[in-house]
Amino acid sequence: MAPAIQANSNGTMNVNGKCRDGHTAEQRNVMDDALPIEITVEERGKAFAKDPWAHEYSVSEQALRDQERLIDQYHHKVLIVGAGHGGLLFAVRLLQTGNFGINDILIVDEAAGFGGTWYWNRYPGLMCDTESYIYMPLLEETGYMPREKYASGPELRANAERISHLWGLKRRALFRTAIKALDWNDAQGQWKATAQGLGKLQQVKLSADFAIIATGLYASPRIPDFPGLWNYKGPVFHPARWDYSVTGGTPERPEMTRLHNKRVAIVGTGASAVQIVPQLARHSKHLMVFQRTPSGVDQRDNCYTDKARWKEIASTKGWQRQRMENFNAFIGDPKSAPAVNMVGDRWTSMPSYSMTIGANGITKPGYQDEMREMDSIRQGKIRSRVHAIVHNPARADILSPNYPGWCKRPCFHDDYLAAFNEPNVDLVDLQGKGSISFTATGLAVADTQYEADVVIVSTGYTSPKDRSSPGSRANIAITGRGGLEMERKWESGLSTLHGVMTRDFPNLFFPGPAQSGVCTNQTYTLDQLARHVAYIMARGIQQCNGQAMVVEPSEEAERAWADQVVQRAGDSLTAFAACTSTSLFSAAKMTKDQIMNAARLTTWREGIASYVIELEAWRSEGTLQGLEIKRLA
C-alpha cells in the first residue's frame, strides 16, 4: 500500500533527495539533513496530506456560516497565523492591552482545532518534557490545575481549547485553512493573504492591517528521501500523524491491539521516539528500533499533582512567571541561580545546556571550558544510568551518548531504556553502516534485510537550526515592500529589531528565534514575545489616535540590534563544532563571512534573562526608540 506520510501544519511533509551541501542521499546519512518539499503537488502525495483528526471536529451548518462570515468580512485588523500556544498567547496579550477587541482578531490554522503541535501530535505516550506548571500557558489567568507534573498530550490539547473558549477566540478562528502567501500592499498599508481551504471552502483571499506568524518552531515533520520509500507495501507514518487505524487504540487509550501480531520498525531515537518505544514494546509482536545517534535520557519522575501542594504553588500573584524564571535561572544563569529550586527537575541540573540557549557570561574566557567540565560529568552519569538499566552491555554501549549534552535536546523518561531489556525488542545501530533503504517488505541497512509490517519514521521536524526565515518555516511566501522576499533578507545578512520585526516588512511580527532570546521552556519565550509585540502594536495605535498606521524598524535600529546579537555571540557558537549530528554551527565548515552571517542568524546568546531585561528596559523608556510609525491618510 502507499506510504501514509502526512502533511505538516501548513500542508507539507518533508521528502527531498539532496542535502544542504549538495550531496545526494546515498552520499550522506540521509537522516541528517533532508529538506522539505510539498509532496501534495504530486498526484501520489495528495492522499497523504489529510488531517487524521479532522473527523473528530464536527462542522455544523452554523460553524460553516461562521467561517464564511469571517471570509466575507475580508479585512481584519490582526491576522494571526497559527492556533497553538503562540497564536493563543499573541491573541490574549493583544486583548489585554485594551486597544484590540475580539472582533479585530482572525486566527487561521490548517488544523481543525486549537493546540498547534499538541493538535497534530497524538502518538502513544505523548507528554511534555518541561514541567506542566510552567509549560501550560496562562495557568494563573485560568486557574487550571494540571493533573500531572508532566501533562499528557490530550490534557495539553484540552487546555488550548479551554483558553480559546475563555477568551472567545473560537468564533474568530478560520480552521482547515492554510495561508500560502502574504504580500504587502504599500499603498493601502495592508497585508494581502492568499489561503487554501482544505474543506468545503477553497481558495480564500484575506486582508489585514497587522500579521503575526505564530506557526511554531517545529511545525513541519521531516522525512528523509529514503531510497525505495515509495516501493514499500506496508503502512508508513510520522509520529506527528499517528495512524491509529493501523495500530489500534486512541490518543486517550493507546492500547494498540492491532500490533499484537505485527513486526514494527521505528526509525529514529529522538524525543518523540523515546516516548513511543515503551508503548510499542508493550504492544508489538516484534519491535525494531533503528538508531543513528543515541539520545541522552535522564529520569523524568512524573507524579500526580497534589492539591495541597498546588495551593501553595499558585497562591501568590505572578506565581507562574516567577516559577518560569526560577527554572530558567538554573539553566541559563547557574552562577546566580536562586537559593530555592522551585521546579527541581533534571532540566535544572543541566546548566551546560546554556551552551545551546545562551547564558549570562557565555562569552567570558573560561566559560566554555567550565561548561564542558560540568557536561562531561553529567554525560558520564547519563551513560552510567544506561548501563545500570540495560542488561546487555553491548546494547548499553550503543544507547550511550558520546557527545556534549548540548548537541542534542536531552530527553527524560523512566521506561525508555528498560524497553531494550524486553525479548521482543531489537536495536539496530546505524553508525558506520550507511543509510537506510526501503524494500517492498521492510527496511535494509547495508546487506541486512529487516522485514516489517509497519514502519514509523520518527525523524523529527524542520528545525530552527536550519536558519530559514519565519515565512519559510511556516511554508508561506512572504513578500514585503518593493517585492522583497523574506527568504532573501534572511540569506543576505539578517537585521531585525528585537528578533520580532524587520524593515521592509511593515506591520509584520514573528516570534524569533533569530536575534531573539530562547529557553528550554518555549511557552515562557512565546509569552514574553507576545507581551512585547502587543505593547508595540498598542502603542502604535495610541500614537496614531486609533487610525490605520504602519510600523517598522529604522535601518539604523535593526542594524544596531544585529550588531548587538553578534557581539553577544562572541565565539560561543564554536561549542557546536564538536557535535556529531546536525549542529547549529560548525566553524570547521564555514568561511569567515559565513561565520559572521551565522552569528547574525543566531539567538541572543547572553540568555533569556538578559534578553527580557533588554525588552523591558526598552518598553520602560516609552519612546518606541528605533521604530518608524506613520499614520495612514
Curated annotation (Swiss-Prot):
<comment type="function">
    <text>FAD-binding monooxygenase; part of the gene cluster that mediates the biosynthesis of anditomin, a fungal meroterpenoid. The first step of the pathway is the synthesis of 3,5-dimethylorsellinic acid (DMOA) by the polyketide synthase andM. DMOA is then converted to the phthalide compound 5,7-dihydroxy-4,6-dimethylphthalide (DHDMP) by the cytochrome P450 monooxygenase andK, which is further prenylated by the prenyltransferase andD to yield farnesyl-DHDMP. Further epoxidation by the FAD-dependent monooxygenase andE leads to epoxyfarnesyl-DHDMP.</text>
</comment>
<dbReference type="InterPro" id="IPR020946">
    <property type="entry name" value="Flavin_mOase-like"/>
</dbReference>
<dbReference type="Pfam" id="PF13450">
    <property type="entry name" value="NAD_binding_8"/>
</dbReference>
<feature type="site" description="Transition state stabilizer">
    <location>
        <position position="409"/>
    </location>
</feature>
<feature type="binding site">
    <location>
        <begin position="117"/>
        <end position="120"/>
    </location>
    <ligand>
        <name>FAD</name>
    </ligand>
</feature>
<dbReference type="Pfam" id="PF00743">
    <property type="entry name" value="FMO-like"/>
</dbReference>
<dbReference type="GO" id="GO:0050661">
    <property type="term" value="F:NADP binding"/>
</dbReference>
<feature type="binding site">
    <location>
        <position position="135"/>
    </location>
    <ligand>
        <name>FAD</name>
    </ligand>
</feature>
<keyword id="KW-0274">FAD</keyword>
<feature type="binding site">
    <location>
        <begin position="127"/>
        <end position="129"/>
    </location>
    <ligand>
        <name>NADP(+)</name>
    </ligand>
</feature>
<keyword id="KW-0560">Oxidoreductase</keyword>
<comment type="similarity">
    <text>Belongs to the FAD-binding monooxygenase family.</text>
</comment>
<comment type="pathway">
    <text>Secondary metabolite biosynthesis; terpenoid biosynthesis.</text>
</comment>
<keyword id="KW-0521">NADP</keyword>
<dbReference type="GO" id="GO:0004499">
    <property type="term" value="F:N,N-dimethylaniline monooxygenase activity"/>
</dbReference>
<dbReference type="InterPro" id="IPR050775">
    <property type="entry name" value="FAD-binding_Monooxygenases"/>
</dbReference>
<feature type="binding site">
    <location>
        <begin position="292"/>
        <end position="293"/>
    </location>
    <ligand>
        <name>NADP(+)</name>
    </ligand>
</feature>
<keyword id="KW-0285">Flavoprotein</keyword>
<protein>
    <recommendedName>
        <fullName>FAD-binding monooxygenase andJ</fullName>
        <ecNumber>1.14.13.-</ecNumber>
    </recommendedName>
</protein>
<feature type="binding site">
    <location>
        <begin position="129"/>
        <end position="130"/>
    </location>
    <ligand>
        <name>FAD</name>
    </ligand>
</feature>
<feature type="binding site">
    <location>
        <begin position="269"/>
        <end position="275"/>
    </location>
    <ligand>
        <name>NADP(+)</name>
    </ligand>
</feature>
<dbReference type="InterPro" id="IPR036188">
    <property type="entry name" value="FAD/NAD-bd_sf"/>
</dbReference>
<dbReference type="GO" id="GO:0050660">
    <property type="term" value="F:flavin adenine dinucleotide binding"/>
</dbReference>
<dbReference type="GO" id="GO:0016114">
    <property type="term" value="P:terpenoid biosynthetic process"/>
</dbReference>
